[in-house]
Amino acid sequence: MNLGDMYNSGFEFALTGHLVNRNDFKWDMTLQASTFKNEITSLPDPFINGSKRWVEGRSRFDFFLLRTAGVDPETGDQLFLLYEQNEDGESVPVIDETTGEIATTNDWEETERAYTGDSSIPDLLGSVSNSFSYK
């Protein structure tokens, strides 16, 4: 059963060169590169799948995680940036009124996950392969 729609795009490029082409020895090299983009275009309701949140307008490969703020130097506890959900269900930072920075907490259950701005899709994927033959 399909729950939604997504749009995928990208390109793939390959270039092969015959570097040495003699009767008894041949050497070929191939360079390959590709890109890939993904966007969810239709989905009835957003949902979380592991470290990803699937929602219209985002990629299904965007990381949706608890944001860390390092370690509390006084206690050694891990600190998390404090986020809350707005009325649209989006994670927004909670601003500390005294510092003007995003508030922190050492209790991961007090915060919400947020998009990190990172994706599990690399910007560019590539490879180099060589082929040698003798006689």
Task: Name the predicted role of every residue range.
Residues 1-2, 135:
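C-terminal extensions
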Residues 40, 126-128:
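Residue-level marker for the onset of beta-strands and adjacent loop->beta junctions
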